[in-house]
């Protein structure tokens, strides 16, 4: 699996550290999570297709720690779920020469995410034209 794909999945729910504890669900070739921020102001779900993992549900308690552990690995990463008596206890990520073992959380310590009963009205409208897109693109930092 590409580490970049996993990092992209994580960044979409982690929101720069706003959401740390989530339940990941691996099923039918996809990885999904629903999330809620600690202050309950942000609620959402993220899904990644073409995920090569076994079917399981497991708790990721400290997403920042997980991303830091993944940062030491190369781009092509093998992913395994280690379990004891059928219960997932850790995630093992391995590239050619390095492996990391992330300990999973019990699902009872992961916040329950309620169903969204009604989508709120959106009150922000942003009009984009070629000038605003060009300006925004020019203000982005360049990679060195």
Give names to the regions the model predicted.
Residues 9, 31-33, 66, 133:
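Short, structured motif recognition centered on aromatic/hydrophobic residues
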Residues 29-33, 86-89:
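Short glycine/threonine-rich beta-strand-turn micro-motifs
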Residues 137-144:
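Single conserved hydrophobic/aromatic residue that forms the stacking wall/gate
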